[in-house]
Structure formats: structure tokens, C-alpha cells
Amino acid sequence: MKVVILAGGLGTRISEETVDKPKPMVLIDDKPILWHIMNIYALQGFADFVVATGYKGEVISEWVSTLKSPWNITPVDTGLDTQTGGRIKKCMDLYPGEKILATYGDGIGNINVKKLMKFHESHGKLATLTAVRPPARFGYLDMKNGQVIHFGEKNQSDAGWINGGYFVLEPKVSSYIHAISEPFEIGALPRLTNESELMAYEHSGFWQPMDTLREKHDLEELAREGNPPWLREI
């Protein structure tokens, strides 16, 4: 089963790291975050990857050509200005009739892909996304009449659910993407929702995007501590 990884964006919010390389090639513990994402799948038996490239895609292609790995990795140039929906569609159209796994090239977590697949197969809809809790960035205050009565750290579980990627997509999802200039989150996902064809697999475990330098440093700290949650066998 193909795993499509979206790896073509500019990474403007972490531009200090993406002047000479695409965001998925930013290093976490001496390996690109792209490697960590692929390893999440490979540890669970999914090792046939299609990497949708765009900005500085040649850096990814060169890295793949020198990588010593049992994984099957196919970089696909999906265009510099193509949006996430277009990148998914271009990759899906290369493999007509195939169900795919897909995710973003900048978010890692200890997602149980086999449980995700089982959930998808149980409901019979066209698409499943993985719903996650956004990482808590701020503490909280309880106040009464201006006096602080409790000061604490916000738990990740206190926040609502968001789209964390890690999709399962049936072949027909390609027809819900109407233009390569259309973000998947603005076009296809709302259309699928309106037709009751989108389900959410709730993941309460570890999940962390790498949108900022602070988040990169947080991931590096977890990696340096040894046995980070996304590298453990699930």
C-alpha cells in the first residue's frame, strides 16, 4: 500500500532552516523529519513511499538516491506552486484504483497505523483523517476579582481536536480535488464532510508538528533524551 507524504511546501514559518532545503529535510537528531515520518510507517509494515515534492525537491531526490534503506521511495515532482490537494491528486492519479495512506511532511506521532486502517475499513466511508490534540503552548490562570487563585500548565487534552494528517483515502477521493491550486483542507475535506464521507480516527497519544524553530528544538530535545515516542514500536 502506497504512503504519500506531502513534502513540497515552502516552510515559511521555519524559514531559518529552509533557505537551502525543503522543510521535510530539516534535521531532527541528525535525520530529516521526513525519515522519521517514514519510519513511523515502516515500523508497522508500510514501506512503499511516494514523496510529493515541490520546493527544492531535488534535495529530497538526491537524499533518496543515497539513502541505504530497505524502503521503496519514489519522489514525484508535483510542482512548485501546487497546493496540498493538487499534490495528493497528482500522486493518486499515478496509481488509479488504489487506496492510499497519506500525511504531511512535518508532523510526527506514535500513530497506530494498523488501528487507523481497521477503523477506516469499519465505517466504509471514502476518507479518514487522524484527529489529534494540539500541543499545549501556554499555561493557564484561574482568577477571581483580579487575583490569581490557580496557576498551572495546560494539558494537551484540554484543547479540542484538530486534523493531524495520517489519512486513509479511497481512490474516489481524487475526484473531490477540483484543482491543483486547491488546498486539501479547503477543498476536498469540506466536500467530503458535506457528503458525510469523512471520518476521524481519534489519536490521544503523542503528536507534534514542526512549524516553528521552537517546535523543532522540542523534538530534538525528545530525541536526545533517547527512545522518543515516535521511534518506539507500536
Describe each region flagged by the PLM.
Residues 25, 140-143, 200:
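A structural signal for short hydrophobic beta-strand segments in well-ordered beta-sheet cores
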Residues 10, 21, 56, 134, ...:
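A generic "binding-loop/recognition-motif" signal
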Residues 2-5, 13, 27, 31-104, ...:
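Conserved N-terminal catalytic core of the sugar/cofactor nucleotidyltransferase
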Residues 54, 76-78, 130, 201-203, ...:
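Conserved beta-strand termini and adjacent loop/short-helix elements that scaffold enzyme active sites
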Residues 16-19:
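Conserved catalytic-core motifs of eukaryotic protein kinase domains, centered on the activation segment
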Residues 99-101, 108, 114-121, 133-136, ...:
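Catalytic-core segments of class I nucleotidyltransferases/pyrophosphorylases
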Residues 55, 128-141:
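Short beta-strand-to-loop element that shapes/binds the nucleotide-sugar donor at the catalytic cleft/hinge
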